[in-house]
């Protein structure tokens, strides 16, 4: 710009006009760069220096404008004096300011680069520490959650063992509201149901047939069978009570039939023992499956928690990389501004060299200074270029790392979803296995009770055969046996006893003795298995009733 102001004094009007345009262009560019630099001020010292530079620039610009006006007015000598005095002095000062700015910003840029390297190193160290601490926390949480789950599971296992030994006075406390608490609540309801059914069986064993059996649902097989057994026993014992007077007349036929019933009951007892052993084996296998399913559920829950923790840490790493990327972009913009300033400084150095050449012998020292300024500007431009390339490479690698981290986060999300589904399935398997084990235990108890009933029937049959020779003693024994039971609707039972044996009963007993076949099981047309039960009808009080005549059923009579 100083070169252009000097040209105004030596060239013709056309060159003067072009010089004025060049001066205006330099003024606009300089003010644009000053405004751009002002937006990137890094500290208060830089801001104060910039304000001083702008004030000096305004003074320099006003002197240049004054020179232009003098040249336009034809006052060339006054313009020359102004150029050689005030404009040159302020120009030198302004050049010194620009050189100081270049040196200051170069130093600040180097310090900023070193600071960014230190921040990146610190961030890496912090990230490693955070990941290590997160792993320790995840392990601690896994151990803590495992203990929370294993304690109530252990209590339920202990209760199940006691229940398997026949102790119905066990209790399970549901202290939580999670899945374990729900499982404990279900286990508690199951124990209460078994305890209630055990109480019913105890009353039945004591001979109280007035007990009311409540069926929990359509799938409550044991409850329905207990109710059927109570109703059947009530019906059977009522019928026995009604036909007790006829037993004396049919003692001989009953004696023969009782021997056969005893043999059939013995065979049934043997079959039931084999069935009980098989059910116990199935029950043990089912309990083992339930235990394994519970352990798998715990492991799946721990894996799910670890995957979720890793996903959270990946999200934090993405945020940190995004911040590093933004900082690198800002530094890149600042380096570009420094590069532009170095370019302008180079131009100014060239102008200064031209001026020194024009000054001849007196401008040699100034030419040396201008050459050094130009070299410094070139070195600043090269350093800014290399720094820009490094920062751009860092940005690209950061973006690539961010992409990989996002893909890893998405994969972790899919892993969390898969583990959640697997945990749900394993939990369902565990619940189903526990329910199967409980159901098999109940069935095993029911079969044991049936076995006791069969053995009792066998003994009763033998006793009936031995006592059938004494008609009166048999009748009295039967009455005493019936008196042990408390039956429903005792007040409504007829007190009319048959003093003579019904001809229909006699024919029924004779037909049964002649046509009795060995017990066998066959598949009916409806797909169910039949045990060869025979039925007969009798007319009691004008009502027809079906009486089962198979080995097991007739033994109850």
Curated annotation (Swiss-Prot):
Q: Which CDD domains match?
A: HAMP, MCP_signal
Its membrane topology, per UniProt? Single-pass membrane protein
* Key words of the record: Cell membrane, Chemotaxis, Membrane, Methylation, Transducer, Transmembrane, Transmembrane helix
Residues found modified as Glutamate methyl ester (Gln): 268, 281
User: What residue ranges carry the coiled-coil annotation?
Assistant: none
Question: Region entry Disordered: which residue ranges?
Answer: 511-542
- What are the TM regions of this chain, as residue ranges? 122-145
Basic and acidic residues compositional bias: what residue ranges?
Answer: 511-541
Q: Which GO terms describe its cellular component?
A: plasma membrane
Q: For this chain's UniProt record, which GO biological process terms are given?
A: chemotaxis; signal transduction
Subcellular localization is given as:
Cell membrane
What's the main place this protein lives? membrane
Q: Name one GO molecular function term.
A: transmembrane signaling receptor activity
Glutamate methyl ester (Glu) found at: 274, 463
Ranges for domain Methyl-accepting transducer? 243-472
- Give all residue intervals belonging to the HAMP domain: 147-199
The free-text function statement in the UniProt record for this protein reads: May bind attractants or detect changes in the extracellular concentration of soluble sugars.
Q: Which family does it belong to?
A: Belongs to the methyl-accepting chemotaxis (MCP) protein family.
Q: What is the recorded name of this protein?
A: Putative sensory transducer protein
Q: Please spell out the taxonomic lineage of the organism that makes this protein.
A: Bacteria, Bacillati, Bacillota, Clostridia, Eubacteriales
């Amino acid at each position: 710009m100083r070169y252009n102001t000097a040209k105004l004094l030596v060239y013709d009007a056309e060159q003067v006009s072009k010089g004025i345009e060049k001066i205006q262009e330099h003024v606009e560019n300089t003010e644009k760069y000053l405004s751009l630099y002002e937006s990137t001020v890094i500290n208060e010292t830089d801001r104060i220096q910039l304000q001083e530079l702008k004030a000096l620039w305004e003074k320099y610009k006003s002197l240049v404008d004054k020179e232009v006006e003098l040249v336009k007015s034809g006052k060339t000598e006054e313009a020359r004096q102004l150029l050689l005095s005030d404009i040159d002095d302020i120009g030198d000062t302004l050049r010194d300011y620009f050189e100081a700015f270049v040196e200051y910003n170069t130093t600040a840029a180097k310090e900023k680069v070193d600071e960014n390297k230190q921040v990146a190193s610190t961030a890496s160290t912090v990230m490693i520490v955070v990941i290590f601490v997160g792993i320790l926390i995840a392990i601690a949480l896994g151990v803590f959650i495992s203990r929370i789950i294993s304690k109530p599971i252990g209590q339920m296992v202990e209760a199940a063992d006691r229940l398997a030994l026949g102790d119905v006075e066990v209790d399970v406390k549901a202290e939580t509201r999670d899945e374990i608490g729900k499982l404990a609540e279900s286990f508690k309801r199951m124990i209460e149901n078994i305890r209630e059914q055990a109480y019913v069986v105890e009353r039945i064993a004591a001979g109280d047939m007035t007990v009311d059996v409540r069926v929990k649902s359509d799938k409550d097989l044991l409850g329905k069978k207990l109710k059927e057994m109570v109703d059947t026993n009530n019906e059977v014992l009522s019928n026995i009570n009604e036909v007790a007077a006829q037993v004396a007349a049919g003692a001989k036929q009953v004696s023969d039939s009782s021997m056969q019933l005893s043999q059939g009951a013995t065979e049934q007892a043997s079959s039931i023992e084999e069935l009980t052993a098989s059910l116990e084996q199935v029950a043990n296998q089912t309990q083992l499956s339930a235990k394994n399913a519970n352990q798998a559920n715990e492991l799946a829950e721990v894996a799910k928690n670890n995957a979720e923790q890793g996903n959270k840490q990946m999200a934090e790493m993405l945020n940190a990389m995004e911040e590093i990327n933004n900082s690198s972009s800002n530094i890149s913009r600042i380096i570009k501004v420094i590069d532009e300033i170095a370019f302008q400084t180079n131009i100014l150095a060239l102008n200064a060299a031209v001026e020194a050449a024009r000054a001849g012998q007196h401008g040699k020292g100034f030419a040396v200074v201008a050459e050094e300024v130009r070299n410094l500007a070139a070195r600043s431009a090269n350093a800014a270029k290399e720094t820009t390339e490094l920062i751009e490479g860092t940005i690209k690698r950061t973006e690539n790392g961010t992409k990989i981290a996002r893909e890893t986060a998405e994969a972790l999300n899919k892993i969390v979803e898969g583990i959640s589904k697997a945990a749900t399935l394993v939990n369902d398997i565990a619940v189903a296995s526990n329910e199967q084990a409980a159901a098999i235990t109940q069935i095993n108890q029911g079969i044991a009770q049936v076995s006791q009933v069969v053995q009792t029937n066998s003994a009763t049959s033998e006793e009936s055969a031995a006592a059938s020779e004494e008609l009166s003693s048999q009748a009295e024994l039967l009455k005493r046996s019936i008196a042990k039971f408390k039956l429903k609707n005792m007040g409504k039972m007829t007190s009319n006893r048959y003093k003579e044996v019904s001809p229909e009963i006699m024919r029924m007993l004779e037909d049964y003795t002649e046509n009795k076949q060995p017990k066998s099981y066959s598949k009916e047309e409806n797909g169910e298995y039949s045990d060869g039960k025979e039925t007969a009808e009798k007319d009691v009080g004008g009502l027809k009733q079906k009486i089962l005549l198979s080995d097991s059923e007739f033994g109850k009579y």
